[in-house]
Amino acid sequence: PISVAVVGLGRSGYDIHIRRLRGDERFRIAAVTDLIGARSKEVQKEFGCQVFPDVDALLKGADAEAVIVATYSDTHAPISIQALKSGRAAICEKPIADSVADAKKMLSTAEKTGQKLLIHHNYRFFPETRHLLDVVQSKRIGEVFEIRMRALGFGRRYDWQTLRKFHGGVLNNTCPHFLDIGLRLLGSPVKEVFCDLRQIASFGDVEDHVKVLLRADNARVY
């Protein structure tokens, strides 16, 4: 099995990644680290894995071939780059980075080290997403001129995803799911972008309401 280290044991690291790996014979959870040490100890009890106090120690001593980066959004790029330079594949939670420059640095590091880099856009693997892409790309319903996607919910959150210093906000942490699918459905480079950001209900200092309009070269609108 492929040995995996997990950095960050919050909702994504534990509830999504470890839950999916649990019971899959193709993978072995080899090492973990989290800012809250008690979380690491809980995972160690279940899987008998190595526990490290921080990322640096994990990358120096973990018996792992791949590293899952499920940390605050502002740390995705530096930790992924560290993992790649340590000679391991990196599976990074979305968003990839906080800037195009950092994203390009991640890609160039993967190329230079010969290691694999995967950004975890899990929605693209859902059966309904794959079916939707097939229907649009095959033109079975004719030429698509407009695509609409909507996600609704209400919550008065006050955690790291509502704070700018951690690169929180709906645009960074929720919209990547829909932008990833939308860009593939558009099937052409984006020519125009309109974006309206508002903070309506959540605490913190970032947006919790986003309206995005994309217009592609092929005249499709998303």
Annotate each PLM feature.
Residues 1-47:
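N-terminal Rossmann-like dinucleotide-binding module
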Residues 12, 123-203:
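Predominantly a Rossmann-like dinucleotide-binding segment in NAD(P)-dependent oxidoreductases
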Residues 31, 65-66, 146, 221:
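Short, Asp-centered acidic motifs that coordinate Mg2+ and/or phosphate
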Residues 49-109:
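Beta-loop-alpha module in the N-terminal Rossmann-like domain of NAD(P)-dependent dehydrogenases
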Residues 53, 92, 119-121, 194-197:
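Short loop/edge segments at beta-strand edges and connector loops
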Residues 105-122, 142-147:
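Rossmann-fold dehydrogenase core element
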Residues 212-219:
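Active-site beta-strand termini and strand-to-loop segments that position acidic
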